[in-house]
Design a protein with these regions (language model features):
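Structured soluble/peripheral alpha/beta segments that form catalytic or ligand/cofactor-binding pockets
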Residues: 4-360
């Protein structure tokens, strides 16, 4: 993005694509969506859910635990109405109010819940915690869970991990908006991330996408490593339907990525270039071409940052310190269209969501 900030020793190991953890096998186990961190310093973990509802509204929620300056536990909630109106809130919880299970996904923060077994999930947000916004939803998976190899991308002792527990599923239940509750249906997605070092020490940025084209679910990403970790890009592609997985590929030996359509108006000029069109091709001739058409969200992270007591008293100073360090992370989310071309040449049109995270 901008000039380099000191993120620790320069003696940092590069990513080695060939020798990444690959011992768990193809079958994802229920325990893998349970808590994977032990609260050691610099660890973090989150369980993420999003849904596109039949009325055109969008829901995003994430249950987060981080262990940087101190142990912190919070839920972020974003609701976009059918008219495009946006509501966002971040709520922090005390350690005595939270619970994390290791054997399966069972995360509780007061009366808020994220619980499931890779097939079915309950996700609940208490409207009392979120200014009369909330939901009580069920997510039922229609596609097998996915991770690239073991899901752990490691550079020396430092790592970032990702499990797409529900690549695509059916959503049902109720949602409360401004204190009024209604029943809803739609489609949804759930993934789980964890790691043991600040992300800026591993990546400059990433592009991530999920979408549906005909019967096919597509997930892809490209992680852009910082120079001290090799400075190269790490592509990932997954294509599946309800019956089988067609593509499960990771790394530059199997995937080629291309970008175009420079994003001109969303970021400071000193930031690294980011692009709203993204393509990926596998060595066995599957390809995905994405066009980011409509901006759903464009966030300067520090402007949205919410801090618990007592740190919120010093938020202006903390923000100024970060900005003075020339770090200006942005998060942009696009409603997207895409084309999926299968190995036999068949082409399917679809829609999805693409996100760009500029970490520095």
């Amino acid at each position: 993005s901008c000039s380099t900030i000191y993120l620790g020793s320069s003696n940092q190991q590069y990513f080695d694509e060939i020798n990444q953890p690959n011992e768990l096998g193809e079958v994802v186990n229920i325990w893998e969506d349970g808590a994977r961190t032990d609260d050691s310093k610099n660890q973090f973990e989150w369980w993420y859910f999003d849904a596109e509802l039949e009325d055109g509204s969008l829901v995003v929620a994430y249950f987060y635990k981080v262990h940087f300056l101190k142990d912190q536990f919070f839920i972020g909630f974003n609701y976009t109405s059918p008219k495009g109106e946006d509501f966002f809130q971040l709520k922090y919880f005390n350690r005595s109010d939270v619970f994390f299970e290791k054997d399966s996904c069972n995360v509780q923060m007061k009366n808020n819940l994220f619980r499931g077994n890779l097939s079915k999930y309950e996700i609940k947000l208490d409207p009392k915690n979120f200014d009369n916004f909330g939901f009580d939803l069920n997510l039922e998976s229609s596609v097998k869970p996915y991770r690239p190899q073991d899901g752990i991308i490691r550079a020396g002792d430092d790592y970032f991990a990702w499990l797409a527990a529900v690549p695509n599923g059916k959503v049902s239940g109720s949602i409360t908006v401004d204190g009024k509750t209604k029943n809803i249906e739609g489609t949804g997605y759930h993934d789980h991330n964890w790691g043991n070092t600040p992300l800026q020490k591993l990546f400059k940025s990433w592009t991530w996408f999920r979408g549906q084209a005909g019967p096919y679910t597509v997930i892809l990403s490209e992680l852009n490593a910082v120079n001290s970790r090799g400075g190269f890009d790490i592509p990932i592609l997954y294509v599946a339907d309800e019956k089988q997985v067609y593509v499960n590929k990771f790394g530059n030996s199997e995937l080629l990525t291309m970008k175009n359509s420079l994003i001109k108006d969303f970021y400071p000029k000193r930031n690294e270039p980011q692009f709203s069109n993204f393509s990926i091709v596998s060595v066995d001739n599957f390809s995905v071409q994405i066009s980011g058409n409509q901006v759903i969200d464009n966030i300067e992270i520090f402007d949205r940052m919410s801090l618990p007591m007592p740190f919120n008293l010093f938020k202006p100073i903390i923000n100024l310190a970060f900005k003075g360090s020339n770090i200006d992370p942005f998060y942009t989310r696009f409603a997207s269209t895409f084309k999926l071309q299968l190995r036999d040449g068949q082409v399917f049109d679809g829609t999805g969501v693409m996100e760009i995270m500029d970490l520095q």
